[in-house]
């Protein structure tokens, strides 16, 4: 009978839905963190919300709060997870500068995989165990290099701030390219603007336009980091 067939179809749908539900992996902090990172990698940090994570996991926002306190807690977990990927060397008094530089480059590369995520690093106190592991490692390297304790402590903060700001700037460029359909100010365009300036008003900018616009890849990052690190040796 038609009614029976309809009932059978509904039963099959319910059975299929129950089977799919039973096969769905249980919610965990690890799944939440990985889902959040996937969202940031694909759409940027600003797209990350608790509701978005819940929707991607096919659950309700309330379910997340059994594992994550709030968005700030999620941000701290994300930074902690990225810090866990950083390889710490054994402090070496002979190569401490290169060791610190390498750690900064590792952090940079992790953050750049997830556009805008350095905002989370700027907004949290480093209390996550993995973030503290990284801070402990950096402190050990600086102390091994003969940097005074107070200078080393503040240097960690200064170096971290630069890495975060650098990655945030790169993320903003990427976002601008996506928003404006790929349009950005190219090196040649910027050179042209500087060269077109009035020599009476901007004689130095016009004269040193090539130097002001020089650099490829992470050249400027390398320069800034090495300048700061080398300066620590004078203390």
Give the residues covered by each predicted segment.
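Short, basic, alpha-helical segments at the C-terminal edge of helix-turn-helix-like DNA-binding modules
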Residues: 81-85
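Hydrophobic alpha-helical bundle segments that form small-molecule/ligand-binding pockets
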Residues: 134-160, 166-191, 213, 232-235
């Amino acid at each position: 009978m038609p009614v029976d067939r309809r009932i059978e179809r509904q039963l099959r749908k319910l059975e299929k839905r129950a089977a799919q539900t039973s096969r769905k992996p249980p919610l965990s902090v690890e799944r939440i963190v990985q889902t959040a990172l996937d969202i940031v990698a694909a759409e940027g940090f600003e797209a990350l919300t608790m509701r978005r994570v819940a929707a991607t996991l096919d659950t309700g926002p309330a379910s997340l709060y059994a594992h994550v306190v709030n968005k700030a807690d999620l941000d701290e977990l994300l930074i902690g997870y990225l810090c866990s990927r950083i390889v710490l060397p054994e402090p070496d008094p002979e190569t401490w500068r290169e060791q610190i530089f390498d750690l900064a480059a590792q952090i940079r590369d992790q953050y750049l995989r997830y556009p805008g995520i350095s905002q989370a690093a700027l907004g949290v106190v480093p209390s996550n165990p993995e973030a503290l592991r990284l801070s402990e490692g950096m402190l050990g390297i600086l102390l091994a290099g003969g940097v005074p304790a107070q200078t080393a402590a503040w240097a960690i903060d200064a170096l971290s701030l630069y890495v975060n700001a650098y990655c945030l700037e790169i993320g903003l460029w990427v976002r601008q390219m996506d928003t404006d359909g790929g349009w950005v100010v190219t090196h040649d365009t910027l050179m042209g603007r500087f060269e077109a300036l009035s020599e009476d008003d901007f004689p130095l900018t016009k004269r040193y336009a090539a130097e002001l616009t020089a650099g490829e890849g992470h050249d400027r990052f390398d320069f800034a980091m090495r300048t700061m690190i080398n300066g620590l040796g004078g203390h």
